[in-house]
Amino acid sequence: VARARAFAQKLDMPLAIVDKRRQKANSSEVMNIIGDVRDKRVILLDDMVDTGGSLCGAAKALVEVGGAKSVTACASHGVLSGPAIQRIEDSVLDEVIFLDTIPARPEVKCAKIKYLSVAEMFAEAIERIYEEISVSKLFN
């Protein structure tokens, strides 16, 4: 929630939260949408996507229950195991954007999935560590 709040503040946009309860590993049930998403284009943030169940369930709730106009998801790590690709393909998500912290598998073919490179930032961080310069300034 803290990361989403920080993004909302930087973008000067309102914040909504999808409250979910995890019943067991790799499954969750969407419980509530806290905030108004009706007729809005939603950016859904998560740390990682494994099987895609939570992400796709949240997107579905945002559209069907919350009335969102569209949903784009962003996550740091795309594990994408099991049914993840098919779930994303079949979902209401318009686009899913991952960082390339986990290499994209060549067999993964889904027009909704995009990757952003972290190579330049990692290289800069390594250089700063070597030069004994603050790495935290990269993120301010």
What role is predicted for each listed range?
Residues V1-N140:
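PRPP-associated nucleotide enzymes
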